[in-house]
Amino acid sequence: MAACCSSLATAVSSSSAKPLAGIPPAAPHSLSLPRAPAARPLRLSASSSRSARASSFVARAGGVDDAPLVGNKAPDFDAEAVFDQEFINVKLSDYIGKKYVILFFYPLDFTFVCPTEITAFSDRYDEFEKLNTEILGVSIDSVFSHLAWVQTDRKSGGLGDLKYPLISDVTKSISKSFGVLIPDQGIALRGLFIIDKEGVIQHSTINNLAIGRSVDETMRTLQALQYVQDNPDEVCPAGWKPGDKSMKPDPKGSKEYFAAI
């Protein structure tokens, strides 16, 4: 299973890494709704060394060199998803010209860190909606697994009702096209992409398996992106939030900014 309670892992690393121990295969495809499986703790063999334990949540994605870069068009996809306890289809390009998109990947359903992120985004969904932004979650699990997880109470490790779709990437093609797939494990790293209304990736961040993402920072980055797109002659300095002073990206403008802070 995907990691949650372990020593901190680094962000995507160029060094080779050991596979994540104890992750079972994704929920099997079935026409009948599966019962939510009980979460099993990650176990390492007694012979594992201290260094092996420390690196057990460090994984490396394949195809990173081919991953979509900030400033390029996001790879399109058309996939099945679960929303409002129904099966729907989601096509990324349908949002072009209409909405910003927060697209985030997570390793597996019925795990540990993942539900904390997924429910946190759902709890803040109305704030993103006011910024004309849709949220899309993606994992390699089937829609049946997604549905079972949504139908499981939060107090039991489930998600409860969500305000945005969970996309099924059983072919792993979406994860691969965004450069977050870990080939030898068949799951995705915690990648997050902010895509503007033109379908262009404006921000990306990829955490390793043990590190959850911040909804607050995602919101702040989205607000900064929208500000500079509305004010193309200005830039946002470090930690900028709505109401803070921005900067003109020229010698005179920068001097005015630094003199004012």
UniProtKB/Swiss-Prot annotation:
Residues 1-60 form a transit peptide. GO terms for biological process: cell redox homeostasis; hydrogen peroxide catabolic process; response to oxidative stress. One of its GO terms (cellular component) is chloroplast. The keyword Transport does not apply. InterPro entries: AhpC/TSA, Peroxiredoxin, Peroxiredoxin_C, Thioredoxin-like_sf, Thioredoxin_domain. Its EC number is 1.11.1.24. GO terms for molecular function: peroxiredoxin activity; thioredoxin peroxidase activity. Thiol-specific peroxidase that catalyzes the reduction of hydrogen peroxide and organic hydroperoxides to water and alcohols, respectively. Plays a role in cell protection against oxidative stress by detoxifying peroxides. May be an antioxidant enzyme particularly in the developing shoot and photosynthesizing leaf. Homodimer; disulfide-linked, upon oxidation. Interacts with the plastidial NADPH-dependent thioredoxin reductase NTRC. This is 2-Cys peroxiredoxin BAS1, chloroplastic. It comes from Oryza sativa subsp. japonica (Rice).
